[in-house]
């Protein structure tokens, strides 16, 4: 499969996109009950949302790492996701970017975007990247109060897939379905997506 180097792949509907986060039960359980994030979740901190289920599994170790033992599938509006991307800045400047302009945008933007190697179920790095979106300030407020349409605890499914993986099974059919996420040209340019381009020669895996 020829996957573009930087492409958003996600589960989505006509109106929502699913992103993943992992937390301690003290945060996850009240969030699931309230269908929104409530204290002890801290609005003041940057929070990272991840459309890639397998990258989330890499980050949380299949829900085994301290503070990340509950995995939540968070459905947010596609309009909200578009707002986040539109108001984002890459965590690192692109080659050829004016450094001063990038620093100015970084300071002004409430959203950070970074592209990390996508992972296999066994955490091996793949030769293409998945997006991580960091929300702070006004973006966190919008995320918490406007964008979220549902929160589902998928930890049980995570454990089931992990058990199958450890038993040596092919878990492909057990994973959440994902497909390329459509991005308008301007948004793709803002976040550095490469929907039709090969892997840039100057970047490593």
Sequence positions of predicted segments:
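ADP-ribose/NAD+-binding catalytic cleft of ART/PARP-like enzymes
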Residues: 1-43
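Short helix/loop capping segments that flank catalytic or ligand/cofactor-binding pockets
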Residues: 28-31, 57-59, 84-85, 123, ...
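ADP-ribosyltransferase catalytic core
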Residues: 38-115
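Short, solvent-exposed loop/turn segments at secondary-structure junctions
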Residues: 25, 55, 79-81, 120, ...
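Short, structured patches in soluble enzyme cores that scaffold and shape functional sites
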Residues: 24, 76-78, 115-117, 135-137
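Partner-binding and oligomerization surfaces adjacent to conserved cores of proteins
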Residues: 6-19, 92-94, 125-126, 132-133, ...
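Catalytic-core elements of nucleic-acid end-processing and repair enzymes
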Residues: 69, 111, 119-122, 133
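Glycine-rich, aromatic-bearing surface loops/beta-hairpins
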Residues: 131-205
């Amino acid at each position: 499969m020829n996957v573009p180097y930087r492409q958003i792949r996600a589960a989505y509907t006509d109106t929502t996109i699913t992103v993943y986060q992992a937390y301690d039960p003290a945060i996850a359980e009240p969030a699931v009950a309230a269908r929104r994030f409530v204290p002890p979740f801290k609005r003041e901190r940057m929070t990272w949302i991840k459309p890639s289920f397998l990258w989330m599994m890499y980050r949380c170790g299949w829900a085994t790492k301290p503070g990340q033992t509950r995995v939540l599938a968070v459905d947010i509006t596609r309009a909200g996701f578009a707002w986040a991307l539109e108001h984002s800045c890459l965590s690192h400047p692109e080659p050829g970017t004016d450094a001063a302009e990038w620093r100015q945008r970084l300071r002004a933007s409430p959203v950070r975007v970074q592209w990390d190697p996508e992972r296999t179920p066994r955490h091996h790095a793949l030769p293409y990247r998945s997006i991580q979106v960091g929300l702070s300030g006004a973006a966190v407020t919008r995320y918490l109060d406007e964008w979220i349409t549902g929160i589902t605890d998928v930890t049980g499914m995570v454990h089931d897939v992990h058990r199958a993986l450890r038993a040596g099974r092919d878990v492909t059919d057990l994973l959440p379905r994902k497909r390329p996420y459509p991005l308008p040209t301007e948004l793709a340019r803002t976040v550095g997506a490469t929907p039709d381009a090969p892997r840039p020669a100057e970047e490593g895996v």
